[in-house]
Swiss-Prot record:
The PRONE (plant-specific Rop nucleotide exchanger) domain is responsible for the GEF activity. One of its GO terms (molecular function) is guanyl-nucleotide exchange factor activity. This is Rop guanine nucleotide exchange factor 3. Residues 16-28 have a biased composition (Polar residues). It comes from Arabidopsis thaliana (Mouse-ear cress). Residues 1-28 are annotated as: Disordered. Guanine-nucleotide exchange factor (GEF) that acts as an activator of Rop (Rho of plants) GTPases by promoting the exchange of GDP for GTP. Residues 95-473 form the PRONE domain. The lineage of its organism: Eukaryota, Viridiplantae, Streptophyta, Embryophyta, Tracheophyta. Pfam families: PRONE.
Length: 473
């Protein structure tokens, strides 16, 4: 088993929104981990697979057929508990089949000891919180398994087993993040009582099965690239401008890729290009994978929006929103007429994604600055009364209006650049997040988003080379 603690793994992802395999320095120590280099700076449901670390017990049928004298249901052995022995036998059979080697076992012990100690192997109690530790572990596992996977081909059997086994272990934490909901229980004597039963927390109950399904679909997508009509040149055997086919002929190959990405493998196609069937299949796979990418990105954005804003971020906000966005943008936003964010973005002439991220940071900071000033200007103290700022009478407050316009501008900016990397606030939320469930969902959705984006980029490379070859005929 490869060690998860590998900050030098390469990703192939051209958008900083997702994990970038194109940058050799992508997997580095996140700013929110003060104890370990095995982490990553970035910028998204009930488990279908029963974890080997926890046995899920259904308590809905855990009552006897007869009521007690006090009419309280008497707990007896449930149906699911009767199945535990069978599940344990199946689990033991799986263990026998897998036969984890001694080095792998020692690596897992070390890794989970690291999780327990918060990445502080000295045991001095100075480690990061559990949420950050698990987030880093999932990110590092992704880098270990997919870091060197830079082409459209099935994942190696060993890496697939590593990914599935360790993700099941990391996701098993969610089995214990539950909430209680009321449920009516019908007794044998006809009486109905209301009992409380546990189920996974709402966000986990909804999102985790969806993420597992997306994970499975991405694995199937990679498995489908067998016996393809395209292939890859050996790394270092050709430049970005020429390639040599298996027949010994030379032809010009131009890939849609920055010149500094020289270490990435170059896709090759036959001299006449791909067949119509192969080209159609590639386009269909690209479309389906792109939908997976959008779904993972939506889940990630949703989880991030639910995370609490750290106090450390609020303390760094400027006292004036105007100083954050700049004079020209502020002048346009503070106009008395109707605000058109799309026109403002057109006037800014954003030429790169880096500029877009900087603008998003500034607009987001100004938005929270104006919101804070709007709340402070209100004399009401309780939160329920502060929410009355939504009333019509208070919509005339200048700070409130500016905060609304900043939010609209930020929304339009993210719509125009859907693969925009995470803002400073998002990174700060991940850094100071202490909710283990949200940390699992955020990191899991983020790595799936990165993998989906990479697959789409690799397919685009093949289609571009195919188009170039057909155009040169």
């Amino acid at each position: 088993m490869e060690n998860l603690s590998n900050p030098d793994e390469n990703d192939d992802h051209q958008s900083p929104r997702s994990i970038d395999q194109n940058d050799q320095s992508a997997v580095e120590t996140p700013v929110y981990s003060t104890m370990s280099i095995d982490s990553f700076v970035y910028p998204r449901t009930c488990s279908e697979t029963t974890s080997g670390f926890s046995d899920q017990i259904d308590e809905t049928n855990s009552f006897c057929s007869e009521a007690s004298p006090c009419n309280w249901p008497v707990l007896t052995e449930s149906k699911s508990s009767k199945c535990l022995s069978g599940l344990e036998m199946q689990s033991n059979e799986c263990l026998v089949v897998q036969e984890i080697s001694e080095p792998e076992l020692e690596t897992m012990k070390e890794r989970f000891a690291k999780l327990l100690l918060g990445e502080d192997m000295s045991g001095s109690g100075k480690g990061v919180c559990t949420a950050v530790t698990i987030s880093n572990a999932i990110t590092n596992l992704y880098a270990t398994v997919f870091g060197q996977n830079l082409r459209l081909e099935p994942l190696e059997t060993e890496k697939r087993a590593l990914w599935k086994r360790e993700m099941n272990c990391l996701l098993s934490v969610c089995d214990y993040i539950v909430e209680f909901i009321p449920r009516c229980q019908n007794l044998s004597n006809g009486a109905t009582v209301e009992v409380m039963e546990s189920r996974p927390r709402a966000d986990i109950y909804i999102n985790l099965p969806a993420l597992r399904k997306l994970d499975s679909m991405l694995m199937e997508a990679l498995d489908s690239f067998q016996n393809t009509e395209f292939w890859y040149a050996e790394e270092g055997s050709l430049s970005m401008k020429s390639a040599r086919s298996s027949t010994g002929s030379f032809r010009k190959v131009i890939v849609q890729r920055k010149e500094e990405k020289w270490w990435l493998p170059v896709p090759l196609v036959p001299s006449e290009g791909l067949s119509d069937k192969a080209r159609k299949q590639l386009k269909n796979k690209r479309e389906s994978t792109n939908q997976i990418h959008k779904a993972a990105m939506a889940i990630n954005s949703s989880i991030l929006s639910e995370m609490e804003i750290p106090d450390s971020y609020m303390t760094t906000l400027p006292k004036c929103g105007k100083s954050s966005v700049g004079d020209s943008i502020y002048r346009y936003m503070s106009g008395s007429g109707r605000f058109f964010p799309e026109q403002l973005l057109d006037c800014l002439n954003i030429s790169s994604e880096h500029e877009a991220v900087q603008l998003a940071d500034r607009v987001e900071a100004s938005m929270y600055t104006w919101r804070r000033k709007s709340c402070l200007s209100n004399s009401k103290n309780s939160w329920n009364m502060v929410k009355d700022l939504m009333s019509t009478t208070e919509r005339t407050d200048k700070n409130y209006v500016m905060a609304e316009r900043a939010e609209t501008l930020l929304f339009c900016l993210k719509q125009r650049y859907p693969e925009l990397s995470q803002t400073s606030l998002d990174i700060c939320k991940i850094q100071y997040n202490k909710d283990v469930g949200k940390a699992v969902l955020e990191s899991y959705s983020r790595v799936l988003e990165g993998l989906a984006f990479n697959i789409v980029a690799w397919i685009d490379d093949v289609l571009y080379v195919d188009k170039t070859m057909r155009g040169s005929e």
